[in-house]
Amino acid sequence: MQPLKRIPSIANFKKLIILTAMCCSSFFYSNTYAENSTLAAVPQVELSQYLGLWYEVARKPMYFQKECAQDVTARYTVNEYGNIAVDNRCTDMDGNILRSLGEGFVVNEPFNSKLKVSFLPESVRWMPVGRGDYWILKIDSAYQMVLVGEPKRKYLWLLSRDPHPDEAKVTEYLRYAQRVGFNLKDLIRTKQTE
């Protein structure tokens, strides 16, 4: 004869449902809070250290990068107007190098952590239209890795001075992005062949 099995009581089911609801609501609340909270840029960026070549490690989908298959880089220099010249490059599926030139305008001097970037033709870049937010959200003290995003959390880039950075550091930066409200379900990891 088999021993009788204990049937959970209604009270235990209610407790389980309440506990599950509390856990789910706290998870939902924390994610919603992060997504709706104000996004903060780093306190200050030393532009002279930020300039130079960066390799893209990962990104959220961006319409102007839809043809980029690998080897995405960004080079930042100071242009003749004292703004940031942006030279983005990538390789498409056919092996062609694609290039996009733009200009970044610092909007929070002297802190230099928030820019507006335009990829409009050079002759009309002076107009304050067609400029996207480019906020530096996290950067290490040696300026070797940077997380860049924008306040609506639709776009995000993880850049590194090394085409193949330490995976633990990559994970650290991506976890930070999640903590401040970025949904990384559509994150694209960039292939670098260098």
What are these regions (language model features)?
Residues 3-17:
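Bacterial N-terminal signal peptides that target proteins for export
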Residues 17-27:
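Bacterial N-terminal signal peptides
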